[in-house]
């Protein structure tokens, strides 16, 4: 398996930051009440992940090991500030909706974890691909969880898409069910916990099913050496 395919498999499935590593749960649970919010935070996290991995990989040979963590945090904070300013300028409604969770990307364990575990030990291209696939893995879980919660809670999909994509995206809103009142359990953090648990359980079931279909490798017989005389 090529390195890119292995990185893709790890980021999207085998070592998914949300479903396997269980990192970044605070924004995952708090922001994913709609697809729009989930996608907005996912894109922001993806941009910071790729940017931080590339930057850390470029300077990895010039930063003393004793101060590498503070340097990584400063790099991540600078990139988050850039993303925050861009979102404030071009997606102000989404910026207000996400609120404090945009600057909190600085403390996201996914980003500092990939910078320390992978980017600081590899060249630029593999580090960029690692950030890309880990970011896409996190974004995919955010979007799936956001769609589940929005659909069950409000009976809609892509509500508020205009906050992210512009006024034309208001036409993307789909009313799947008509509720007299919102189902608050799905929209509040307890519903997010339940949703994440269901997604983790589903992944484990799929992994077990795939594992069961794999041919079992026969263990070679172990020959014991005789230590006594005949």
Swiss-Prot record:
The chain crosses the membrane at residues 18-38, 39-59, 69-89, 93-113, 124-144, 182-202. Its EC number is 7.-.-.-. Coiled coil: none annotated. It is a multi-pass membrane protein. It comes from the Bacteria. The keyword Signal does not apply. InterPro entries: NqrDE/RnfAE, RnfE. Pfam families: Rnf-Nqr (PF02508). GO terms for cellular component: plasma membrane. NCBIfam families: PRK12405.1, rnfE. Part of a membrane-bound complex that couples electron transfer with translocation of ions across the membrane. This is Ion-translocating oxidoreductase complex subunit E.
